[in-house]
Regions:
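N-terminal beta1-alpha1 ligand-phosphate binding loop
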Residues: 2-39, 45-49
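Short, structured patches in soluble enzyme cores that scaffold and shape functional sites
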Residues: 15-17, 69, 135
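Short basic (Lys/Arg) and small-residue
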Residues: 65
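Flexible, gly/pro- and Lys/Arg-enriched active-site loops
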Residues: 43, 50-61, 71-77, 81-158
Length: 158
């Protein structure tokens, strides 16, 4: 059973998949995220197609969602890992192709640095597949100069 926080926090979560029917998997994950306990889906970005970043394999389908949640960050992470596991997620090596990848990008304005969780996500500012969909739903969270730094990374809005 999840422990609810006394106040809600606006969290941003990145979604990605490149195995199986990646588009259907990401859309299902958005639906699953909307049903998490003590959580409400606020907004979802468009879907985007990107080549694997520092990896090989099929193209990824990516998106970002905004969630209003009373789950603490650690519990939210556990819920995301559960959804990944339900989609058959395996972690054989770093940047391996994946059925579903869910990452907490931002959790309110909080900074968290534990052995299992780093928020803001430590590599989010380097990746167009995160920044472009995040800027679509929360432009105030992505400085324009940051978007310009990743402009050379190919990304296609679907």
């Amino acid at each position: 059973m999840s422990q609810a926080l006394p106040t809600e926090v606006l969290a941003y979560v990145a979604l990605g998949a490149n195995l199986g029917d990646a588009r259907a998997t990401v859309l299902q994950a958005v639906n699953d995220l909307s049903r998490l306990p003590n959580t409400q889906l606020v907004k979802a970005s468009s879907l985007y197609r990107t080549a694997p970043f520092e990896a090989s394999g099929p193209d990824f389908i990516n998106a970002v969602v905004a969630l209003m949640t009373r789950l603490d960050a650690g519990e939210l992470l556990l819920q995301l890992q559960h959804l990944e596991n339900c989609q058959g997620r395996e972690r054989p090596f770093k940047n391996a192709p994946r059925t579903l990848d869910l990452d907490i990008l931002l959790y309110g304005d909080r900074t968290i640095n534990t052995a299992t969780l780093q928020i803001p996500h430590p590599r989010m500012w380097e990746r167009a597949f995160v920044l472009v969909p995040l800027a679509e739903i929360a432009p105030e969270r992505v400085p324009q100069e940051t978007l310009l730094r990743v402009a050379d990374q190919p990304i296609e809005r679907l």
